[in-house]
């Protein structure tokens, strides 16, 4: 997990990890699981190894199914159902139109927490080795957050990074990086 106050540099770190920005000093490198001794400088070419769930709602206008298939166009019904379950979005199957429920731009018609869980399901379908969640549980109640974190942390052979203000998220992480802003005694 990466924690820090607003303005401490969490967003900058995300931008560096995704090679959307370049460091003014030093360099960002990535090592392969197969060849940990080999380190490559991060470039936009590494971005395909990441799945990123940003803070807030990122759903598109269309059906829930269409939004999920953006993560994996060839996903089967079984894979979609599993991703919804893993992201605590089982509620989708109880909606009158289920996966064919329409949502407007920014997930209109759904609560913020529901839209966030669908975005997480889409990320799980994308199936990349590094999963980056930026305040992805902020709109969830504590019980749903707990279950979601347990489900995500059962994912095997992935690097999972949570950017968060919520210390409860840190309880599920092997390592916690505290970023201190200016004037905080870096």
Where are these regions (language model features)?
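Conserved post-Walker A segment of ABC ATPase nucleotide-binding domains
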Residues: 1, 5, 15-82, 147, ...
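ATP-binding Walker
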Residues: 8
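ABC-family ATPase nucleotide-binding domain "signature/switch" substructure
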Residues: 12, 51, 56, 64-67, ...
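Conserved N-terminal beta-sheet scaffold of ABC transporter nucleotide-binding domains
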Residues: 25, 98, 135
């Amino acid at each position: 997990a990466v924690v820090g106050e607003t303005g401490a540099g969490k967003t900058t770190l995300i931008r560096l990890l995704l090679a959307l920005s370049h460091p003014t000093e030093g360099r960002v490198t990535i090592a392969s699981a197969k060849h940990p001794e080999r380190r490559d400088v991060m470039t936009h070419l590494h971005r395909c190894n990441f799945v990123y769930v940003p803070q807030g709602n990122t759903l598109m206008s269309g059906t829930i199914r269409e939004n999920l298939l953006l993560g994996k166009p060839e996903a089967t019904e079984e894979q979609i159902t599993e991703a919804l379950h893993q992201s605590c979005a089982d509620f989708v199957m109880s909606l009158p139109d289920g996966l064919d429920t329409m949502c407007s731009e920014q997930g209109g018609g759904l609560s913020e927490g529901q839209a966030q869980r669908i975005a997480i399901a889409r990320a799980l379908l994308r199936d990349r080795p590094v999963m980056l969640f930026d305040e992805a549980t902020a709109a969830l109640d504590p019980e749903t957050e707990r279950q979601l974190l347990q489900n995500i942390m059962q994912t095997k052979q992935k690097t999972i990074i949570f950017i968060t203000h919520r210390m409860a998220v840190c309880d599920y992480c092997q390592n916690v990086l505290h970023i201190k802003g200016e004037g905080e005694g870096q």
